[in-house]
Amino acid sequence: MKKVVLLTCTIIVGGQWGDEGKGKIISYICDKDKPSIIARGGVGPNAGHTVNIGGKSYGIRMIPTGFPYKEAKLAIGAGVLVDPEVLLKEVEMLKDFNVKERLIVDYRCGIIEEKHKIMDRKDEHLAKEIGTTGSGCGPANVDRVLRILKQAKDIEELKEFLGDVSEEVNNALDRGENVLIEGTQGTLLSLYYGTYPYVTSKDTTASSFAADVGIGPTKVDEVIVVFKTFPTRVGAGPFPTEMSLEEAESLGIVEYGTVTGRRRRVGYFDFELARKACRLNGATQIALTGLDKYDKECYGVTEYNKLSEKAKEFINKIEEVTGVPVTIISTGPEMHQTIDLRNEL
């Protein structure tokens, strides 16, 4: 009889237009669940993540955001585009976290070259109408489709990091180890399901992130979709619940993109889009960030029963509309400012 192995694979997905606070949630889960591998899916260095540790902020674009947990291998899946310059700078920046010794870059990763970045920034349609980050991902993906894109195995500077991420991840799952897969950007930026044409250059849902790191759908145990109480968006495109900059400032919400430095547009929570995002990703759980911005009384609260009634009603409505439990709640930027209800499922 075939032995049944308990699945221990979790995918983290953004449920809006990116910048939902996935970095904070990933850091928290890594600290609590202690995965053996943290694997990054997604497009490439067009998405930035901010990780706050002990009052210090790290803005990263290539290395998995779970890097503070030093016991895990850090993997970049074959579906991810790699900018060697950005990657090597981050390896150096994060040397205190032993990133160099833990990093595995799949040898099949596509490579972004300078020509791709130049094309991205000079293309009037992409730069002005769509609002691209200028990181070269779109043009590089074009070359990938044409089968002329270089791969990581062709780049001398990456030789020491090369490996087979699919094998690493599947072997870890076969051993019953925890594996965390990081998605980037957000569901509503998906090339297929987002606000086309104001989208990124590939799909950004859970199924694509699984494919990016080389695992099949039956290996996935949990899909945690991350929402923030006041969604934001960088660049052009529809934003049904958008508020004015003045309204955002009155709420104390002034944010800038990690990659572009552009001011983020801010809106009110869209329950219907949240429902759709949960469906598209097959969400099993929801992580909610920025509850302290929704209600300042919730700042730093670590127990659910100490939240305000206003906050509880908001959480209950999210669960009712989406049909998915809210299990992780962030009440501040630091890792310990978190309510974890996963054991109550």
UniProtKB/Swiss-Prot annotation:
Catalytic activity reported: IMP + L-aspartate + GTP = N(6)-(1,2-dicarboxyethyl)-AMP + GDP + phosphate + 2 H(+)
Residues bound to substrate: 258-264
Residues at which GTP binds: 18-24, 48-50, 264, 290-292, 330-332
Single GO term (MF): GTP binding
Cofactor(s) named in the record: Mg(2+)
Keywords (A to Z) from UniProt: Cytoplasm, GTP-binding, Ligase, Magnesium, Metal-binding, Nucleotide-binding, Purine biosynthesis
Nucleotide-binding listed as a keyword: yes
Subcellular location: Cytoplasm
Active-site residues from the entry: 19 (proton acceptor), 49 (proton donor)
Record pathway: Purine metabolism; AMP biosynthesis via de novo pathway; AMP from IMP: step 1/2
Top EC class for this record: ligase
EC id: 6.3.4.4
Residue numbers binding IMP: 19-22, 46-49, 133, 147, 185, 200, 262
Residues binding Mg(2+): 19, 48
Any one GO cellular component localisation term in the record: cytoplasm
Top-level taxon of the source organism: Archaea
Chief location bin: cytoplasm
GO biological process, one term: IMP metabolic process
Cited SMART domains: Adenylsucc_synt (SM00788)
Record's cofactor remark: Binds 1 Mg(2+) ion per subunit.
Subunit and partners: Homodimer.
Membership in a protein family: Belongs to the adenylosuccinate synthetase family.
Main function: Plays an important role in the de novo pathway of purine nucleotide biosynthesis. Catalyzes the first committed step in the biosynthesis of AMP from IMP.
Name this protein carries in UniProt: Adenylosuccinate synthetase
Classification lineage: Archaea, Methanobacteriati, Methanobacteriota, Methanomada group, Methanococci
Encoding gene (name): purA
